Amino acid sequence: LGSKVAVVEFENDVHKSLEYALRLIGKMDDLNTPRRPVVIKVGVFDPKAENHTTVSVVDAIIKSFSKAPRIFLAESDNYRGKALDRLQLWKELFSDRVEPFSLSDDTETRKFKFADEELELSHILFKPNALVSTHILRGYERGSILKNLFGLVPDIRKARFHKRLDTLLADIYEAIGGIDLAVLDGTYFYDGFGAMPHIGEDGAKYRVKMNTLLIGRDAVAVETVGAILAGMKPEKMPVLKEFVKRGLGEGDLKNIEVVGASFESLRKRFASAAKTQRNTRAKGDAPQTWGGQANQVMKSLVIDGFFKLPNKRTVDGVTKAFEARGISTEDKEDNIAGILARRVKKGVLRSAKGPNGWVYWTD
């Protein structure tokens, strides 16, 4: 077996459990060295939500790189806020050695062509720096560890890449020389609507505490094992399929050595957690269908001022905004047009027919 993924459960001492997981997957001497700064790419879409790696897990990762001369907690700007503002979630971990880093503000960059477009990536992402990708364990078709690379794109207009996301992420992975360590934070398990990036403050309502960590040097293998625990089918996840097709990691569980806790026992625990979440959603107000989720996203777009003048939005523009908030829009433009028409009828939006079709706005 070529790839190894450690799966460990923990109680209070996250660092001790993470250290144990690292011992299970093998030596870290090539990463934890005075010669290599470390970049920890955290994934924080919305600072108001809690669907990001916990402070405790990031702290444990930092402590595991005891020899690293510098450690950067890295993120880029998005429409929810500046990177440095969103990184304040982990401010208690900042020190002379550990610092927040905005990938959007770096002036020392390298140019690469991605998905038919030239982008500039921060210099800290390239070797010899060691790159750690950490995100939450969730039932989300686009994944977590590999999807986290989307945050390496420095500008806020990331939505333009959503329909080519799998290609873009694999291109970025190859350009920077890959992920050196993947840490999937299963302190909580997010599923259904709770797994969506745009969930906001309601995210904490739709999660189950699991206190589980998945760690490995093969990021594709870690994503695969996490997806299976989350009840997903890796072979049907576009991002994973693209990485496997390029030979960037192992996506077949039969070829992955899962060490640590009993994987079959954990699968049963996570299946039970998913059932608990379904019951919670059934009793609560979380939308469970595409239409329900789409209406929730439309409501958030209106509240966030997406339609506020001078902006006048087309159906195509709204479709891209849906994609940016994690809603699949394939073959859904007519549905989105219908949602917009209903908002106009209710007086929430105004509309007019322009030279390029209908546009929508609020005063």
Question: Can you annotate each of these PLM segments?
Answer:
Residues V344-G354:
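A short, conserved structural fragment
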Residues T329-V344:
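Short amphipathic alpha-helical interaction segments
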